[in-house]
Amino acid sequence: MSANKQKKLSTMEVDPNEDVSSSSEDDDDDEPHPDAYKGNEEVQIDFEGRAPVDPDAQGISQLLQRLFLRAHINCNQMADLIIAQNFIGSVICQCDDEGTESETEDDNMVEDGTIFGITSVLNLTAKKDQPSIAQLRTYILDRAKTHASPEVQQQLKEILDSEQRHVGFLINERFINIPAQISVPLLQSLQQEIEAAKAKKMKYDFGTLLLLVKFYRKESKKGKPGEDVYTNAEDELLSDRAKFSFEYSMASETDSGMSGDWLEGDAVMTPYRKLLVLEAKKLPQLIDDIQRFINGE
């Protein structure tokens, strides 16, 4: 998906309880806004996917920061890596209502548009000497040491240490309340781009994919079972399909991705992360499973 060939994804009905144009400073404001979302409101937005380009760097970095929070990972440098391989992956942006009439107008839309999501993959094996990738590898192993079983720690170390079977870090981040169906064309496009790169003998022949997903846990109370709510609905299915995984609480860190004005009576949920270990060869099947999951099949 080249930068100058946008692919319309679909029209989404989005709950506007997150101000997509707000700054990170606004995320820390806990006071309810007089115009806060009151529930049962919908806004229709047309989204499209296109290749990431240089002006997207800040938006991609902010999405990565929401995933890693206070982790010592250089999200700016990671965003640059994603853009440098712009033949792989897509960003989500809003369609131009008036249509694109010229390359100049297209360039202006790219420069001025908000990035609503990013779907891509980074090679943790081939790029292990890049600062942000080295930091990510350390982060994963450190979290596993604290929160995973000894067996999972050992398996994860062996996977990351292997030079023969490359490991891809799958990135599937978007603003909350953008429905899960948008993930299918993005992941399908990513799979096609990976296959095209493999055909050119590029380093995208992965044995394993790692995916870090966000979810929130409503703790059990008064005999009621706990409940996990995934930020991206499809991540619940991927979690079930993972070869193995481990999770950890982010309660001590502020998750700006879910900040905003809560509905009165909503329970405050504890933010978590879960690292999923997926077999790369099963990605096409996983995408089909997501489609059926979305369709309620």
UniProtKB/Swiss-Prot annotation:
InterPro entries: BCP1_family. Residues 1-40 are annotated as: Disordered. GO terms for cellular component: nucleus. One of its GO terms (molecular function) is protein kinase regulator activity. Belongs to the BCP1 family. This is Protein BCCIP homolog. It comes from Drosophila melanogaster.
